[in-house]
Amino acid sequence: LTAESGAPSAPAPGVMRVVRVSPHRSEGESIPLIMWTVVLALLPAFAVGLYVFGWRAAYVTVLSAASCVGWEALIQKLRGVRVTVADGSAVVSGVLLAFVLPASVSWYVPVVGAFVAMGIAKQAFGGLGANFFNPALVARVFLQFAFPSQVNMPEWPIVAPQVTGLARLAKSVAPGSPDAVTSATPLAVLKANPGAAWEAIPGSQPFGPPLAWLLPAGAAWAVFALLVAFAAAGIYLEATRGKRLAAVAGVGALLLFGVVPTGDISFGLVPGCIGETSAWALLLGGLALVYYRCINWRLPLAYIVTVAVLASVLPTRAGDGSLVVGFSFERTLVHVFGGGLFLGAFFMITDMVTSPLTSKGQVAFGVIAGVMAALIRLYAGYPEGVCYSILLANATRPLVDRLTMPTVFGSRRRAAPARPAG
């Protein structure tokens, strides 16, 4: 099969058949099935985006997805290869691009971003499976510098909190809209003042695991212990008998009821990009991808845990250049739930084309990206580091694959050539 046409060709005698470029699947799952499953898994986050940002969330998302489909079809026509937009990969890139943009951007911002994603980051490298970097994130970086006043704002709009229910869907967060209120994102507030009181962080109240609100303290801890045992049993059954439903159900119940906190900051009712604000919605979609084995759970787990650990133990540089030293549980919660970490962990760093092939490599890849994200958040001038951390990690993927791929039986790794004396 050729990389773009997908048409079978009979190999000459003694010549091996060339198959499609990655991603390769061995479970009877096609690329369109995987891509459209990802689109469905993004629907919970999209629904939250509609509620938080009004109808413009749908406007930007549909425009971005349609632009990616249109640009990819046009470029494939110009290249003289088969148009493959029905596989859903362009739709996934378009939705993810919209999810990392504010809902208030002008119409041309996602259109230009879609061209960069499809034309430069994807088709210029040969199309699906040949790109080295995540197309949506490449476009996001370009837009950040091309339209800084629309993409990097000091204050971000959301529909006013006093508007409730379905009435929020009819409201607009366009510049100057009377239906919108603006404020800094949780990470921006934390970046400017790492020692800020917890109550000063947008969306911080009320806050706590669901069990803490539903049950008395003693009963909550008892149920939490049962959830831990349930999750451990599920992981054991998945590892020994392949019972992935047990693992996903056990870990999912533990996360949703005992770990991931409630509150505006985790439900997504805070300023930010369209699809990144709700940790709960993204976790639901991510667990679905894990269940259907569209992604390897080790990679998002390694990424999130690395960011959480480093945010807990490393000193933080404040906006005035001073260092804030000391552990803060609330500061760690903001780093985990107050930005784009869950969106990047479940839907971007797990891209099959730009992530390593082996489980060991994916763990290493997640740690590398997590270290980069934490360092950017804590010490660079930009409050969010997910986008850059994943792109930088994408550049290390060939090396990670080389170091973690198992050695073929009966072969040896090629030794480096000896340097001449003198």
Q: Where is each model-derived feature located?
A:
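C-terminal ends of transmembrane helices
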Residues: S22, G70-V81, M118-G129, A229-A239, ...
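Long hydrophobic alpha-helical segments that form multi-pass transmembrane helix bundles
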Residues: P135-L282
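Alpha-helical transmembrane segments in multi-pass membrane proteins
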Residues: T37-A45, V60-E72, S89-G94, A98, ...
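Cytoplasmic-side transmembrane-helix entry/capping segments in multi-pass membrane proteins
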Residues: R82-S93, V109-F115, A130-R140, R241-G252, ...
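Structural signature of hydrophobic alpha-helical transmembrane segments
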Residues: G54-S67, S104-G113, L215-A225, I265-A279, ...
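Membrane-interface helix-loop-helix junctions at boundaries between adjacent transmembrane segments
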Residues: A90, V95-A174
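Loop-to-transmembrane alpha-helix initiation sites
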Residues: F132-L137, S278, T332-L341, Q362, ...
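N-terminal signal-anchor module of multipass membrane proteins
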Residues: T2-E72, Q76, A421-G422
